[in-house]
Amino acid sequence: MQLNSTEISELIKKRIAQFDVVSEAQSTGTIVSVSDGIIRIHGLADVMQGEMIELPGNRYAIALNLERDSVGAVVMGPYADLAEGMSVKCTGRILEVPVGRGLLGRVVNTLGQPIDGKGEIDNDGFSPVEVIAPGVIDRQSVDQPVQTGYKAVDSMVPIGRGQRELIIGDRQTGKTALAIDAIIAQKDSGIKCIYVAIGQKASTIANVVRKLEEHGALANTIVVVASASESAALQYLAPYSGCAMGEYFRDRGEDALIVYDDLSKQAVAYRQISLLLRRPPGREAFPGDVFYLHSRLLERAARVSADYVERFTNGAVKGQTGSLTALPIIETQAGDVSAFVPTNVISITDGQIFLESSLFNSGIRPAVNPGISVSRVGSAAQTKAIKKLSGGIRTALAQYRELAAFAQFASDLDDATRKQLSHGQKVTELLKQKQFAPMPVSEQALVLFAAEFGYLDDVELERIGSFESALLAYANSNHTDFMKNLAKSGDYNDSIKDQLKAIVEDFKKNGAW
């Protein structure tokens, strides 16, 4: 059969008309080496810093090193079956995690996937893990308190909503206990909590989750887990994931509290990644940008203005400020706060609570050292009652420490010095507190009132603990309404002062401790 030229051209035109062109531009590359969770990829000319790269087996890597001939990426998950020659492709997206109220009460991994066996999470959307912190104009000064429930902290190193307060100390000095109690204290305050566990044993994390559940605080908390068995990449990214989940509440005019436990382990994970990527090491073998690692994370904790919230929610929320308060934890070696990472984080944060192993071992718990613990912005956020009644506490402790050191060398002391030493010992005893027993403002105010106005002077040192518990039991049973109102308002005036005085004096007359 012969076709003439007209038929051939018609046939070609028909075929061209029927041809459906579906073109999809893809930037692909080839793995050239795999080692210790780091892959080097040839190709991927259009890849961006921090972009997710799709690997075989529904896994992802994050591009961290963009070099002339190759891309260095860190694998998120298992990498043992990856091999040279495998094909990978760009996604055009940066890492995002699920956010929303559906995460409250759940335990998730760095990627926001549930690991508590309670089924899928009903999230409100996704948010990038790396976000630029709010600017200066979008921020507002810190003037509302976050009550930790610890007398020693709320009176001497108060924390405000939107503040960054570092908890620093050697291992086994009660850093995690302090942070967990601060979360438990928020169960009725309306502050949402996020606990980020980095590089800890799975058994330790399970214990923390159980304690939060026992004390009714888990329903108000998101637990983000990157345990010691996870890859360095997931440990490095966990704080950013938790922060994105906290920002969801901050940007909608609510208050949130996030605990990073602890950033020393995140810095070690980042050092491991950087050295494997062949980045030049600096002091203590950390990379040059380890300061930026923590500063870009902690600057996202802020109190944002009502205008920012209104703009973010497109007018749905008006006249409400939002806040994200951060409690980063840093572990020191033999009390050395001048090491690289501790000094970095101290300079970024708005104050630090320094926990001392010598105090902890001598039975003073929480082991807060009032001499070098400081809150740079929190005093503006203190409740009136605590502010008025805690003024003499720090002074009494400072004088006591000075005199105690001096008294070791002096054989005979005058009455005034003896009185100051005795008062300091009693205040130290009074500030001791058991774990999982946060105190409301009203109870703290009553106890501080008794210390401030000399009602402890005739109480024996070993009876201080029983005096305190009996006084609180008496006040809560006989003056219930007053204690409830004081816990709500945190106010202080002549009327409240007279009422506190009457409670303590009536109780002392009773003498039932």
UniProtKB/Swiss-Prot annotation:
Predominant place of localization: membrane
Catalytic activity: ATP + H2O + 4 H(+)(in) = ADP + phosphate + 5 H(+)(out)
Residues holding ATP: G169, D170, R171, Q172, T173, G174, K175, T176
Subcellular location: Cell inner membrane
Swiss-Prot/TrEMBL site (Required for activity) positions: S373
Leading EC class: translocase
Alphabetic keyword roster: ATP synthesis, ATP-binding, Cell inner membrane, Cell membrane, CF(1), Hydrogen ion transport, Ion transport, Membrane, Nucleotide-binding, Translocase, Transport
Membrane topology, record value: Peripheral membrane protein
MF annotations from Gene Ontology: ADP binding; ATP binding; proton-transporting ATP synthase activity, rotational mechanism
Pfam name, any one: ATP-synt_ab
Presence of keyword Iron-sulfur: no
Record's GO cellular component terms: plasma membrane; proton-transporting ATP synthase complex
EC number: 7.1.2.2
Function according to Swiss-Prot or TrEMBL: Produces ATP from ADP in the presence of a proton gradient across the membrane. The alpha chain is a regulatory subunit.
Sequence similarity: Belongs to the ATPase alpha/beta chains family.
Quaternary data: F-type ATPases have 2 components, CF(1) - the catalytic core - and CF(0) - the membrane proton channel. CF(1) has five subunits: alpha(3), beta(3), gamma(1), delta(1), epsilon(1). CF(0) has three main subunits: a(1), b(2) and c(9-12). The alpha and beta chains form an alternating ring which encloses part of the gamma chain. CF(1) is attached to CF(0) by a central stalk formed by the gamma and epsilon chains, while a peripheral stalk is formed by the delta and b chains.
Protein name per UniProt: ATP synthase subunit alpha
Protein's organism: Actinobacillus pleuropneumoniae serotype 5b (strain L20)
